[in-house]
């Protein structure tokens, strides 16, 4: 929808251009965060640099290789599977629209502007979205959230006061910067059992009960 209005602004001189500008500004100004219901936020994802995320094609191939059966199933598996399905469908429609726009825009400058917008802006958003949900399915949502917080703390800490290497998601339990709040469970050392003097009759009845 944003791309549609952008095309109108670039290529049309009809009265709908002004309306498209207003609608495009409204869409960009909407406070919609696709990560809120999963405990994350756009700000948390923004701590990760753009070159951190694989290409959309690689992410789609990864999702298909790992979760193809669940993604193609008519059953509801999890909110992350549903989000991946929707993102995959939206990306396919966006590519079809971008191809159509590229074929029908005569002005090379306008065509390059549309292609650049899709690749830079929309492409990054889809890469972030796909990476987040694939990672949540692979490592668990709590681990991914902990990683995002840990990376955010690391990247904002001056180099002189932080470890030389950034946290790595696959090794997070060993290298995380920020641990989850709350007491860690204590390991209780087994105490030696007290020997009780039992009569032979009591011992026999106990062994009979354990067999049942």
From Swiss-Prot:
Annotated GO biological process:
microtubule-dependent intracellular transport of viral material towards nucleus; symbiont entry into host cell; viral penetration into host nucleus
Pfam family name, one: Hepatitis_core
Q: What does this protein do?
A: May regulate immune response to the intracellular capsid in acting as a T-cell tolerogen, by having an immunoregulatory effect which prevents destruction of infected cells by cytotoxic T-cells. This immune regulation may predispose to chronicity during perinatal infections and prevent severe liver injury during adult infections.
Quaternary assembly: Homodimerizes.
Q: Indicate where this protein resides in the cell.
A: Secreted; Host nucleus
Residue spans with biased composition (Basic residues)?
178-206
Origin species, per record, is: Hepatitis B virus genotype C subtype ar (isolate Japan/S-207/1988)
Q: Tell me the segments the record calls region HBEAG.
A: 25-27
Which InterPro entries does the UniProt entry name for this protein?
Hepatitis_B_virus_capsid_N, Hepatitis_core, Viral_capsid_core_dom_sf_HBV
The record's comment on protein family reads: Belongs to the orthohepadnavirus precore antigen family.
Q: Which UniProt keywords apply?
A: Disulfide bond, Host nucleus, Host-virus interaction, Repeat, Secreted, Signal, Viral immunoevasion
sequence repeat ranges?
A: 184-189, 191-197, 199-205
What does the organism's lineage look like at the top?
A: Viruses, Riboviria, Pararnavirae, Artverviricota, Revtraviricetes
Annotated segments matching region 3 X 8 AA repeats of S-P-R-R-R-R-S: 184-205
Q: What is this protein called?
A: External core antigen
**Main location, first listed in the record:** secreted
Query: What are the boundaries of the region Disordered?
Result: 165-212
């Amino acid at each position: 929808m944003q791309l549609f209005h952008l095309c109108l602004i670039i290529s049309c001189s009809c009265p709908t251009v002004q309306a498209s500008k207003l609608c495009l500004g409204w869409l960009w100004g909407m406070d919609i965060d696709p990560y809120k219901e999963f405990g994350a936020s756009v700000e948390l994802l923004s701590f990760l640099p753009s070159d951190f995320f694989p290409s959309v094609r690689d992410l789609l191939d990864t999702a298909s290789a790992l979760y193809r059966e669940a993604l193609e199933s008519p059953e509801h598996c999890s909110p992350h599977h549903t989000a991946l399905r929707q993102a995959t469908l939206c990306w396919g429609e966006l590519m079809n629209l971008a191809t159509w726009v590229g074929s029908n825009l005569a002005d090379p400058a306008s065509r390059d502007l549309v292609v650049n917008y899709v690749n830079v802006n929309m492409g990054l958003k889809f890469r972030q979205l796909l990476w987040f949900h694939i990672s949540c399915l692979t490592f668990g949502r709590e681990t991914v959230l902990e990683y995002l917080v840990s990376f955010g703390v690391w990247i904002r800490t001056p180099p002189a006061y932080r470890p030389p290497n950034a946290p790595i998601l696959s090794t997070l339990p060993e290298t995380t910067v920020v641990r989850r709040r709350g007491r860690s469970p204590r390991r209780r050392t087994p105490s030696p059992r007290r020997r009780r003097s039992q009569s032979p009759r009591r011992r026999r009845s106990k062994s009979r009960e354990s067999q049942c």
